[in-house]
C-alpha cells in the first residue's frame, strides 16, 4: 500500500474508531427522571420505576441481578435515603430476578398473593430458592399506604398477563406502573401457566 493511500484511508477511518470507542464505554442502562422525585430505569427486561420519598426509596420491579446492581448503585449516587419498599408487579424473572440484590437493603417486599405463590412455585421447580428474595408482604384486592408525601396504591383486577398482576398508582404524581399488562408497540402476552 502506498503511503498516500494509507494516510487517506486512515484519516477516513479515524472518526469511526472514535464512535466505536465511545460505544464501548457507554452505560448499558438509562435513567429518565419523570419529575423531581420519580424516575424510570431501563436496561434489560421491564421498566423499573423508582420514587424518592422523605422516608426512603420505593422501587417497582427489579429486573435481573446485574441490572439491580446497576440500579442500586445509581440510586445511591442520587439519594442517601435507605430503600423503603420494593414492589413486584408480577412474578416473572425479569421483574423479580433482581430482588435478591435488595436483601439486607430493603425491609419490605410487596406483591399480590398469587404473584408470591407463583414466584415460590417456579423457584421450587427450578431449585433456585436460594437466589430469590420473596415478598414478605402481600395483598389480595387493594393495598394503599402513604409513603412520604405520596400515597401509593396497588390494585388487583384479576388475571391478565399472569394471575397475580398488580397495577401501581403513585397518586400525587398521577403515575401508573402496569408491569407487563401494557406493552409498547407489541401485543400483550398471557402466561397461561400462572
Regions found by a protein language model. Give the residues of each.
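Conserved beta-strand hairpin/beta-sheet module of binuclear metal-dependent hydrolase folds
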Residues: 29-73, 166-170, 174-180
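Short Pro/Gly-enriched beta-strand edge/turn motifs at strand-loop
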Residues: 30-38, 123-127, 148-153
Amino acid at each position: 500500500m502506498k503511503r498516500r493511500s494509507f494516510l487517506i484511508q486512515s484519516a477516513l477511518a479515524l472518526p469511526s474508531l472514535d464512535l466505536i470507542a465511545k460505544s464501548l464505554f457507554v452505560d448499558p442502562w438509562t435513567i429518565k427522571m419523570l419529575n423531581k422525585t420519580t424516575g424510570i430505569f431501563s436496561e434489560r427486561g421491564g421498566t423499573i420505576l423508582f420514587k424518592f420519598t422523605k422516608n426512603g426509596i420505593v422501587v417497582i420491579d427489579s429486573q435481573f441481578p446485574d441490572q439491580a446492581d446497576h440500579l442500586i448503585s445509581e440510586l445511591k449516587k442520587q439519594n442517601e435515603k435507605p430503600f423503603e419498599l420494593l414492589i413486584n408487579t408480577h412474578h416473572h424473572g425479569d421483574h423479580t430476578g433482581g430482588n435478591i440484590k435488595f436483601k439486607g437493603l430493603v425491609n419490605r417486599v410487596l406483591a399480590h398473593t398469587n404473584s408470591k405463590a407463583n414466584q415460590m412455585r417456579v423457584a421450587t421447580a427450578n431449585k433456585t430458592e436460594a437466589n430469590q428474595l420473596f415478598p414478605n408482604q402481600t395483598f389480595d384486592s387493594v393495598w394503599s399506604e402513604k409513603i412520604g408525601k405520596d400515597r401509593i396504591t396497588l390494585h388487583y383486577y384479576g388475571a391478565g398477563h399472569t394471575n397475580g398482576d398488580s397495577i401501581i398508582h403513585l397518586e400525587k404524581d398521577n403515575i401508573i406502573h402496569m408491569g407487563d399488562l401494557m406493552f409498547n408497540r407489541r401485543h400483550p402476552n398471557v402466561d397461561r401457566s400462572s
